[in-house]
From Swiss-Prot:
This is Coilin. Residues 558-585 have a biased composition (Low complexity). A motif (Nuclear localization signal 1) lies at residues 163-170. The lineage of its organism: Eukaryota, Viridiplantae, Streptophyta, Embryophyta, Tracheophyta. GO terms for biological process: RNA processing.
Amino acid sequence: MEEEKVRVRLVFEDRRILSKYQKKQGLTRSWVVLNRKCHRTISEFSDHIFHTFSLCEACPHGLSLSMEGFVLPPFESSCVLKDKDIVCVKKKKESLLEIVGEDSDENVYNAIEVEERPQIRPGEMLLANEEFQKETGGYESESEEDELEEEAEEFVPEKKASKKRKTSSKNQSTKRKKCKLDTTEESPDERENTAVVSNVVKKKKKKKSLDVQSANNDEQNNDSTKPMTKSKRSSQQEESKEHNDLCQLSAETKKTPSRSARRKKAKRQWLREKTKLEKEELLQTQLVVAPSQKPVITIDHQATKEKHCETLENQQAEEVSDGFGDEVVPVEVRPGHIRFKPLAGTDEASLDSEPLVENVLWNGNMTKKKGQKWGTEKSGFSKRYAQDFNEDATTQPAEAETLANCPIDYEQLVAYTGSVKKGDVIAYRLIELTSSWTPEVSSFRVGKISYYDPDSKMVTLMPVQEFPIEKKTEEDDDFCMQPDTSLYKEDGSLEIEFSALLDVRSVKTSSSDSAEVAKSALPEPDQSAKKPKLSANKELQTPAKENGEVSPWEELSEALSAKKAALSQANNGWNKKGSSSGGSWSYKALRGSAMGPVMNYLRSQKEI
């Protein structure tokens, strides 16, 4: 008994049959199982391959199977195939003129003979030998026809080409020439093919009857159109090949990035390398400095600013040296002002040689005119007002200097009560761990409130330049081995809950009472604060009280009550005038009239 299922090896000789995906899977050489119950004949087996590999588009006319160079007929039984046989799969071609690139007369003649030859069916008798014997002069007729064919080939008219130009070996029936021809004319090659085919057919069918000749003429017309279609197909295939070549050339020449893109990429790489080098230098400097050599840790903002400016100048000098040489370097004279100076003179030049800029302040009511400086007016009153305002501005830094120079008695400071405001300067204490891991209350420290969250009640305190934060470091080995338990960050800021601060006192507030709070903290027992105050009724009040006799809290309360009374009197006076005139004063009216500068002057004097 033969096996019902046999393994067969398939080889696709023409790789254009399979798709790209199938080629990637390696199906050009594959195994297939042949079930002899289902596939009894070779045609059924070829249909099975046709459908399993989905070759409908690639092989519209079917497949032809062959083994060891011999074709397997479709009507043959599948028992011909044995286990592990190699079967070659080819594409079945059309019945007429499917040979690509062969347009000779012999191929055309052979194709027509194949069509005219009757199909041989099994069981029918062949009578070709008997008919050939009955005919007389069979060999002679064939020789005569061959001679006539040679004469026809010799008398084919040739095109005359000019001697100046070389004859091109390329086919002249290109797409460009077809586009130029508006009328539907046949090419010379097509005419030659049709003429040769018609002559051969006529000579071969001279001996037939008139009825048969009429039928043959119809077939002749059909045959003349077929070689035309063949030549068209060949030209289309040539055009498709040219198009594929152009696509391959365009794919090979890939677009390169532009010059600007390359420069930007190089600049980005340079910046990354520069930042990496800076980080490495900072780490090295931190590692070199030992922690035991730091007796007192102080946060100095001026030193950090100077270092930052130096690094900026060095970076700018490097950039300039890379591009234009060591000729000019930008130097920051003051905030927002940069001047270009030679590199040799930057170290020797000092900021004292630069002229001082006028401290110009804007009062909110002045506008700049042509040929006029910002913040100055041509009227005499504005000049006097600006002088008075500058005097007040100069007195405030003097008070700040006294605060910085003189030591503050934290016990005399007023307790910080009320709502926490941004910008207030407070003194506070903390509970810190000592070297023996025991809690201890620290000394008074001063910080400025930079951020406050009322929901979580978290406060961010920034250090003040006049009051640096000091941390005592012990020289014991045990203390050096312990980790850093400090609550402060690297920049000196402290982020803590407000309730965790102990004994909070106000050093300087953002309101107008800041100077009085600071003065109360200074140890000056025998000084009287005398300041004339101008009320709405133009009465001078000179309260003289000594700080030693009265507490600072009472002073603040009295000052607030006096200001409230002055404001209430001023409001009553304005309301009376407004009622008599029939309307109240608006902000626009104050700005448009001469009362605007007067009100600003009074506000600057802190009287209203």
